[in-house]
Regions:
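Membrane-anchoring alpha-helices and their flanking helix-loop junctions
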Residues: 1-93, 105-174
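Histidine-centered phosphotransfer motif of kinases
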Residues: 99-105
Length: 174
């Protein structure tokens, strides 16, 4: 992260993260969709695929927003965006009670939606690259969080899935 952002007020930090997310998850897929190939035939199936794609984009954006809002609400008073990738607190509420990585899951959903909408190989390739990066980063972050939070994070690892929510195990209360 840039040094100038180290002590930025959190509202300004949220705005900068939002602008970055729009660039990464809207502008980049659009530009990739313009690479090579002719326009595909139009018709009811295409319209349905685009509609489903746009719904997937909206769902992913909503999940990302919910995750960001959970961080905003959980941040201690006086907290400012700093250069660490992970905050100084363990967040277990909001979407983080269902998935350890709701931001990545939301981002992947946005890219999946654009891939369905644009139906271009370059956008599908972008989705694959994003998913591979998210998987690698999530494993790296888990090691850092285990070091930082110890047993609390180990419990969280056992209770909450990495990506998608799962049903409770039989005989256990949630």
């Amino acid at each position: 992260m840039l040094r100038c952002m180290k002590r930025m007020p959190r509202t300004a930090g949220v705005l900068i993260w939002t602008l970055g997310a729009v660039a990464m998850h809207a502008v980049v897929p659009f530009e990739l969709s313009r690479l090579g190939g002719r326009a595909r035939p139009q018709g009811p199936a295409t319209s349905a695929a685009r509609g489903a794609g746009l719904l997937t984009v909206a769902a992913g954006a909503a999940l990302m927003t919910w995750a960001l809002a959970a961080h905003y609400q959980a941040a201690p008073r006086g907290w400012a965006l700093d250069s660490r990738l992970t905050p100084g607190y363990l967040l277990r509420r909001g979407p983080y009670r269902l998935s350890r990585n709701p931001m990545y899951a939301g981002e992947a959903a946005v890219w999946l939606g654009w891939a369905r909408c644009y139906r271009r190989p370059a956008v599908w390739a972008g989705l694959a690259i994003q998913c591979a990066a998210f998987a690698a980063i999530a494993r790296w972050e888990e090691q850092r969080l285990l070091t930082r939070f110890g047993g609390d994070y180990q419990d969280y690892l056992q209770q909450v899935p990495r990506w998608a929510p799962r049903s409770p195990k039989r005989g256990t209360a949630r």
